[in-house]
């Protein structure tokens, strides 16, 4: 018989960190390009500074050691969190120091939020508009005031305290970033321990995070908001800790608090239905979701994720193994199925990032649609500028994330994909029939483009010929979105069957009554007609084109019929030489570049649609004479022609930004002008011949040489790729800032 040595029986704790792997030194900060042998030599030409920007964060190009790359990314995440905490601290500090928050809290329907007062240097104080309550400042549309009220903040002191707390958290994050790279750096196996990661992220971040938030909502936000809704002066409301310590205070508002935890342990949970509700609809006082519904929601989410955080097998031999789940996942048409994907996701952070960006981008777009249909914060729905800003912001974020997903998926294909370990699995099979996928997608784009645009062209032509009876419209040839109307109707009626005790459906947009706060419409049923049907198909068209470009970039990142050895050329390259009908602009990077323009098209039309539709059919006022909308319901009549969009939306609604000079909105007029310039400047880089600029530079250098003032660093024109990068950056920046100023000047003036 074999006797195991005693040391083997003692369970040793796994060491998952390396101690002091990288000495701390500031010397590298003084050496630009220290991460690359070529760049570290210093600049020979002006291209050096562009290469520096392109590669500074490309950790893959600094080293091939996956462990070191993982540590750098991990450490950088703490830096990112630190920056976020500093930014948040600044927001809360502005609320505490420069805002009219306390005044707004006492009368949120008449006073507008402001947290910035412009200093008078040479007349800039004109920007300090009268926001009501005797306060002069810039009206803000970030939604922070509504968020603060919803979370139960009643004084500027509380905002100060939170701002200081956020700075402390920022310090902790920066320290953690340094510590986990220089002092205790995790080993690669720690980064690859997916079961443990899933358990911690699900149970810790999402489960305990939601539970903590539910606790805050129940114990602090609920009593504060209940008293505020009842009209109690914020200064009279007890301090947050008093609600925690004095149960009698809570019991006055929510009687079940007097019973303590007895109903919980006796499974008599319905006792708690005074503060954990399932009402549906909006609070008529604030126009926001019921806070008791949201507390209930977060508690339920917490339970779900705490359970989910115990699903995966770690130290105890029970639970799921991610590798086993993936490898068991085989369909009738997917060959080896998901075999090999586990290896991809534990060795390629680009693959992991691509999936996460696609999901986060989609989630951001879903958030933007819920911000208006189910406004979560008090008095958010009646603050039209904030509603428009939040929708637009989350749409842009979503679009950028989805383009980023394609970028990193393509980088994965070029740098990390191993054909040998992906034989006949789902990824291999997708790649093998990529021609069918792309050609079908191409056909769909052509079909959608011609048919959707064709409807508009038809209408513009009939309109010009004076034949309104032959147009597609709600009053002539109707193209009603019957499926969307069916979905609306079903959701409006659903609670009668699925939640008989609920007071309303999930959103007032489905149907039912108008929710108005102080005579201003918060939300109401949104009627859909021919104009919506038409623009919906433009959305479908632009989204499919964006997907076509991005997906083609990913599926052909390694090889194509034109360039079979594309993987050897890398993620970005300008051309593969002359001939073959042209080999320029085929790199995966170029597909992301082109995809960004179509993403911009897609999002622009979505936010234009939203802005006009809401002003026409939702936003406005309710008086004794009935409902009056900002643009009087003109969406249905005008949005079915291109001319209608140009005349009744872009032109008619830009008057506020164009005529803003000399008013508190004049900054938007200047931004509108300046952003148009930035956008136009981008075209110089996009419609550009590189040789032209190089030739121009040569003659300028010749003149400098003649005068003996030639620089030591040789000037060079931007490379094709660099020029396109500068071009797309300015195109998007200029376009977004133009749209932003146009939207805000309009909605602040009329909303």
UniProtKB/Swiss-Prot annotation:
The lineage of its organism: Eukaryota, Viridiplantae, Chlorophyta, Mamiellophyceae, Mamiellales. One of its GO terms (molecular function) is electron transfer activity. P700 is a chlorophyll a/chlorophyll a' dimer, A0 is one or more chlorophyll a, A1 is one or both phylloquinones and FX is a shared 4Fe-4S iron-sulfur center. Phylloquinone binds at residue 693. SUPFAM superfamilies: Photosystem I subunits PsaA/PsaB. Signal peptide: none annotated. Chlorophyll a binds at residues 684, 692. The chain crosses the membrane at residues 73-96, 159-182, 198-222, 294-312, 349-372, 388-414, 436-458, 533-551, 591-612, 665-687, 725-745. This is Photosystem I P700 chlorophyll a apoprotein A1. PROSITE patterns: PHOTOSYSTEM_I_PSAAB (PS00419). The keyword 4Fe-4S applies. The PsaA/B heterodimer binds the P700 chlorophyll special pair and subsequent electron acceptors. PSI consists of a core antenna complex that captures photons, and an electron transfer chain that converts photonic excitation into a charge separation. The eukaryotic PSI reaction center is composed of at least 11 subunits. PsaA and PsaB bind P700, the primary electron donor of photosystem I (PSI), as well as the electron acceptors A0, A1 and FX. PSI is a plastocyanin/cytochrome c6-ferredoxin oxidoreductase, converting photonic excitation into a charge separation, which transfers an electron from the donor P700 chlorophyll pair to the spectroscopically characterized acceptors A0, A1, FX, FA and FB in turn. Oxidized P700 is reduced on the lumenal side of the thylakoid membrane by plastocyanin or cytochrome c6. It comes from the Eukaryota.
């Amino acid at each position: 018989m074999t006797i195991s040595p005693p040391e083997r029986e003692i369970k040793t704790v796994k060491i998952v960190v390396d101690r002091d792997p990288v000495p701390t030194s500031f010397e590298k900060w003084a050496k630009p390009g220290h991460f690359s042998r070529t760049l570290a030599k210093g600049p020979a030409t002006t291209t050096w500074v562009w290469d520096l920007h392109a590669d500074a964060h490309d950790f893959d190009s600094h080293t091939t050691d996956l462990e070191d790359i993982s540590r750098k990314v991990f450490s950088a995440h703490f830096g990112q969190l630190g920056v976020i905490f500093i930014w948040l601290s600044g927001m809360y500090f502005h609320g505490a120091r420069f805002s009219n928050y306390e005044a707004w809290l006492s009368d949120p329907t008449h006073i507008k939020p402001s947290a910035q007062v412009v200093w008078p240097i040479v007349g800039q104080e004109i920007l300090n508009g009268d926001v009501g309550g005797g306060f002069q400042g810039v009206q803000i549309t970030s939604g922070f005031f509504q968020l603060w009220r919803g979370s139960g903040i009643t004084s500027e002191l509380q905002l100060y305290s939170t701002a200081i707390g956020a700075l402390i958290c920022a310090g902790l994050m920066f320290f953690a970033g340094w510590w986990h790279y220089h002092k205790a750096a995790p080993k690669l196996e720690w980064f690859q321990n997916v079961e443990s990661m899933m358990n911690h992220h699900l149970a810790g971040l999402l489960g305990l995070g939601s539970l903590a938030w539910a606790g805050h909502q129940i114990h602090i936000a609920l009593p504060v908001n209940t008293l505020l809704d009842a009209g109690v002066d914020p200064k009279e409301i007890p301090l947050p800790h008093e609600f925690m310590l004095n149960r009698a205070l809570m019991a006055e508002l929510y009687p079940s608090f007097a019973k303590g935890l007895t109903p919980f342990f006796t499974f008599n949970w319905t006792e708690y239905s005074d503060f954990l509700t399932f009402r549906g609809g909006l609070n008529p006082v604030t126009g926001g979701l019921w806070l008791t519904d949201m507390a209930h929601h977060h508690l339920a989410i917490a339970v779900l994720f705490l359970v989910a955080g115990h699903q995966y097998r770690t130290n105890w031999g029970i639970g799921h193994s991610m590798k086993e789940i993936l490898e068991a996942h085989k369909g009738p048409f997917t060959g080896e199925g998901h075999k090999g994907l586990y290896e991809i996701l534990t060795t390629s952070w680009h693959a992991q990032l691509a999936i996460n960006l696609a999901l986060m981008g989609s989630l951001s777009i879903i958030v933007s649609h819920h911000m208006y249909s189910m406004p979560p914060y008090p008095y958010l729905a009646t603050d039209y500028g904030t509603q428009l800003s939040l929708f637009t912001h989350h749409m842009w974020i979503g679009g950028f994330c989805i383009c980023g997903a394609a970028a990193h998926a393509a980088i994965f294909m070029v740098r990390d994909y191993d054909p040998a370990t992906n034989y006949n699995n789902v990824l291999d099979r997708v790649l093998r029939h990529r021609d069918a996928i792309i050609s079908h997608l191409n056909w769909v784009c052509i079909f959608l483009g011609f048919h959707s645009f064709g409807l508009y062209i038809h209408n513009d032509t009939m309109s010009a010929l004076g034949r309104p009876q032959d147009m597609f419209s709600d009053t002539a040839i109707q193209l009603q979105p019957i499926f969307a109307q069916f979905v609306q109707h079903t959701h409006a009626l659903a609670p009668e069957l699925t939640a008989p005790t609920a007071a309303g459906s999930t959103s007032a947009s489905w149907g039912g009554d108008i929710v108005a706060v102080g005579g201003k419409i918060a939300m109401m049923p949104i009627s859909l007609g021919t104009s919506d049907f038409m623009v919906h198909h433009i959305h479908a068209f632009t989204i499919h084109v964006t997907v076509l470009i991005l997906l083609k970039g990913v599926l052909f990142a390694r090889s194509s019929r034109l360039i079979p050895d594309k993987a050897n050329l890398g993620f970005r390259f300008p051309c593969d030489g002359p001939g073959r009908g042209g080999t320029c602009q085929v790199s995966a990077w170029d597909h992301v570049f082109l995809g960004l323009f179509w993403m911009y098209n897609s999002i622009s039309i979505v936010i234009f649609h939203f802005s006009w539709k809401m002003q026409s059919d939702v936003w406005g006022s309710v008086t004794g004479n009935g409902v009056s909308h900002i643009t009087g319901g003109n969406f249905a009549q005008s949005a079915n022609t291109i001319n209608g969009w140009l005349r009744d939306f872009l032109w008619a609604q830009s008057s506020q930004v164009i005529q803003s000079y000399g008013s508190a909105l004049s900054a938007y007029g200047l931004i509108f002008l300046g952003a148009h310039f930035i956008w136009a400047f981008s075209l110089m880089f996009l419609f550009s011949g590189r040789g032209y600029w190089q030739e121009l530079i040569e003659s300028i250098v010749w003149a400098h040489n003649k005068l003996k003032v030639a620089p030591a660093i040789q000037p060079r024109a931007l490379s094709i790729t660099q020029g396109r990068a500068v071009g797309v950056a300015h195109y998007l920046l200029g376009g977004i800032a133009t749209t932003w100023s146009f939207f805000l000047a309009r909605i602040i003036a009329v909303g």
